[in-house]
Amino acid sequence: LSGSRKRDYWGPGMNKLSKTKDAWRRALEPDRYNILFEEGTERAGSSPLNDEKRDGTFICAACNNPLFDSSGKFDSGTGWPSFFRPLAEDHIETKRDFKLILPRTEYHCARCGGHQGHVFNDGPAPTGLRYCNNGLAVRFVPRDEDLPPLID
């Protein structure tokens, strides 16, 4: 990020939000809330962001925290927007998910805790990682537009 796009997002540590689930439920559309705060998953192939090819930034749909740059996006063939690296390591957090037979690693927005998706070790170089994101969990901001302010 450069210029005004960078100003409000980088600093010493991530300011975590402490909103309740009820507050998020009132602030978000039901489908977004389900994915972000009930750890739901959207149907594969349902997100228009799969076909998003413009330069820009993918931000958390709950709090506007910048999570991914378009330069790290790739077509994984899975039906979900996929990235091989986050915009900044401290903008996401991971935890083990035991909902299926085999454990997986899920990742969340480090600021609001909103569930984004799962990370796998089958991505392209240079990281070998695939951040498989729910499209409803992020919003795309084209490079020529200012990023929206962070939501408190």
Residue ranges and their predicted role:
Residues 15-152:
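A short Gly-Trp-Pro
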